[in-house]
């Protein structure tokens, strides 16, 4: 088991997590997950490409993303990037999609990874592929010696399925909401508060079923401000995987822009390159100080203040706080 100072995980998105920002997050008491299908494993030096993505007009960005990500993944770069993070003395975490897990996981494990993330729009216990051998998640996790975090799950049944397959953590949501066009392109979106509550209920039932095995519930998406981050934990999440908030950091490789894996799909892009701007350093976004009351910095300070305001001293008890649904009055 790995313990971190704060309930935050850096999302495996090229605009958020590079080897250097993963190292910086580790030194700040959390973990950044590197996208092992991203630009850092396709190009020896992706910085010129990152700069061009940030400079393009929104209407031109998607076509360029498709072009940039058409470059093949290079296993030797997977090894090099993970070694770079490990040499810095922080926790090493990498992510693959279900479609490519079978193809590259041995490279990842041989390179040395502490946490392995399988992240997709929707993940089941057996991923079916026409191009590769199907991924039997239960057998895959059983054969590994590292904790596996899997998602996304959006309801009780899907989450329970992943827990029974052996996942150490379940990602709730489809991630990348600030950059997502899922609602417009395929008509799918997730009410995150309900989804987190449902998955937390699945976790409680699974604990009874398994004799006490605790699975981490990790909210993934719809947390662009600290208030949403706090609400996710109150609904039952143990941690949050943050994308857009960390993409606003001065150190972020997206240079004030943000995009997810859906934006680079070769035939049906379901995401956008969004302008998120820059609000401060990683230190300021996570720990403050804040200089604006807009929820973009000092996420941990906001969590501590909310817990104190509600009379709770730790996240476990905060997860049981009463929650009332009201109309949005903002």
What are these language model-derived features?
Residues 1-210, 216, 246:
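Active-site entrance/lid segments in N-terminal catalytic domains of soluble metabolic enzymes
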